[in-house]
Amino acid sequence: MTTPVCISQAFMDSFHAHHAQLLGKRVWLACSGGRDSLGLALLCRTLFDQGRLPFLPQLIHVNHGMQAANDEWAQQVAQWAQQHDMACQIIGLNLTHKSEQAARDGRYQAMMQLMNQDDVLILGHHQDDQVETLLMRLFNGAGVTGLGAMREWTSKQAHTAQSPPDVNKPRQRIFLWRPWLEISRDQITEYAQRHNLKYIDDPTNVAQSPSKLALQTLNDRAWLRSVLLPHITERYPQASEAMARTAQLMQQASDSIDEQVTQDLAQVALAATEQQSVIALDKLAGLSAPRQAALIHHWLAPYPNQLPPSKRLVDEVLALSFRQDSNHQTCLYFDAGSEQYQVRRYQNKLYRLQHAYAQWLQMMPHQIHLPLAHNAEELSLNLADTDVLSLKQSGLEFDWQLTGVRGLMAHLARLLNSADAKVTPCQLIFEPLPRTIKLALAGRSGRKSGKKLLQALDQPSFMRGSVVLCRLDMMGSDGILQDSSTAVPLFIICIDRIWVLQSQFTALINQLLATEVLSTQILEC
């Protein structure tokens, strides 16, 4: 079998493997003008002309402005695309003085701004790139997932630059497709030479004198390619194939671990939203130490493309989870790249909170007065058009909403009206939970206030600034509030639930909650 057939067969095998995922999607090809990406573009053109490939990808070239020749390269790619009747988009950037990783991230972000949701980007990464990626991650102490290196098909999400993000628009996601991961650089070189492909050689990708270490003049990947790997393959000729096979085995092992973690997480998770996730420590303790570590590793950075936590952070979280003293005030901070998080413990629960959300929790709710005026002949409600009440000031990153306010007030007004035709005017008041008022939770004995009440509400210390009391206050005929003895506490609103208080309206509030007429939620603005 000749080299060109190997290359085209590898591409078609990958195409058939991901045919269902490609259906209905627009396909792009990242083309630097180098041997790998230009060879891939030529192959796509050939397969399309032969009727074997049902689409012709659109080329994207990023002119990153880091070298004097970049403008010339962009022009060369555009001319090649025109000659081969392939659409091509040139993106201009200035990534001068950026690190290797920052420049790579910048190129991806620029391409994603051009692409639509769920578009596919073909990349020319090959077996030698896979080996370099594996070695770089190995030298940085990566675990099983990291040593899986690059996957043939994976998703990538954009880091949103909008603050606050638009919750009505999902964070952009594209798919990366690498059909040549089993093809070597030498095979691609031979293919390019067979077709007289005039590709670009980036001088920063190789050493001028590979016999020297060139530590100062080469980036990490180029140093591995030009200096270290030639010595390895001289001693072990099959090293590249063996290391690429190791990456595949690591991917399989990582998938197996992920399946186990998913099952374990379903057992230990108490609640999970984008803002916070809670796990039960007694159930976590029932897992073996390796499964505990794997679960925490996944739990700390649960979304695609987030930076994986270090082993040190995982160990610190496990130490916090199982410490025996009563001091649970420790807060661990970490940056997952796309999000910053806090990890806190309260009693036998472990919380992962978005850092911005944790700060928002400390902002006090504002006081709200809703008059409820009625008489025996006519019922009138002073309500806004909306049925939703925001419990904290607007303009913040999150909106804490109480839904069903109109229904609540209508039911209260009818009960009061039917009980006494001459009942005095009333109003609903929502306010931060006073620490001095003793309240009785429905279905429980005794009255509590302050810290004991908050403990009964199962509220962690870091959430106690976001607790609201709803009470019904009676007003005199002159419209002035009477003394506090005429107030009827109805319920307490916490971040995650509503607690009903003992009153003559307990049955009504319970019914509204059971039918989900009355509910609370937090939205990201």
UniProtKB/Swiss-Prot annotation:
Pfam families: ATP_bind_3 (PF01171), TilS (PF09179). GO terms for biological process: tRNA modification. Keywords: ATP-binding, Cytoplasm, Ligase, Nucleotide-binding, tRNA processing. GO terms for molecular function: ATP binding; tRNA(Ile)-lysidine synthase activity. It comes from the Bacteria. The keyword Ligase applies. It is found in: Cytoplasm. ATP binds at S32, G33, G34, R35, D36, S37. The keyword RNA-binding does not apply. Its EC number is 6.3.4.19. It catalyses: cytidine(34) in tRNA(Ile2) + L-lysine + ATP = lysidine(34) in tRNA(Ile2) + AMP + diphosphate + H(+). GO terms for cellular component: cytoplasm. Its main location: cytoplasm. Belongs to the tRNA(Ile)-lysidine synthase family. Ligates lysine onto the cytidine present at position 34 of the AUA codon-specific tRNA(Ile) that contains the anticodon CAU, in an ATP-dependent manner. Cytidine is converted to lysidine, thus changing the amino acid specificity of the tRNA from methionine to isoleucine. The N-terminal region contains the highly conserved SGGXDS motif, predicted to be a P-loop motif involved in ATP binding. PANTHER family: TRNA(ILE)-LYSIDINE SYNTHASE-RELATED. This is tRNA(Ile)-lysidine synthase. The lineage of its organism: Bacteria, Pseudomonadati, Pseudomonadota, Gammaproteobacteria, Moraxellales. The gene is tilS.
